[in-house]
Amino acid sequence: MGKLRILSGKEVCIILSTHGFCEVHRRGSHIVMQKRLVDSTITVPVPNHDEIRVGTLLSIIRQSDLPRSEFE
């Protein structure tokens, strides 16, 4: 496992978008991204900050079910 890059909220949303997530709405400083599957829906809130902290980024990765390598 490589080291995670420092990403902005906008960059994270672009990565999620390339994997089928779409922006549902914005509220304050957060963007809610959602991916509909056959039997469920994955919802991931993304803070719209210049730099997302590592712990927050790990939480987004875990919630989105995407491989960590997509964010490195």
Features from the language model and the residues they span:
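Basic nucleic-acid-binding interfaces
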Residues: 1-26, 30-72
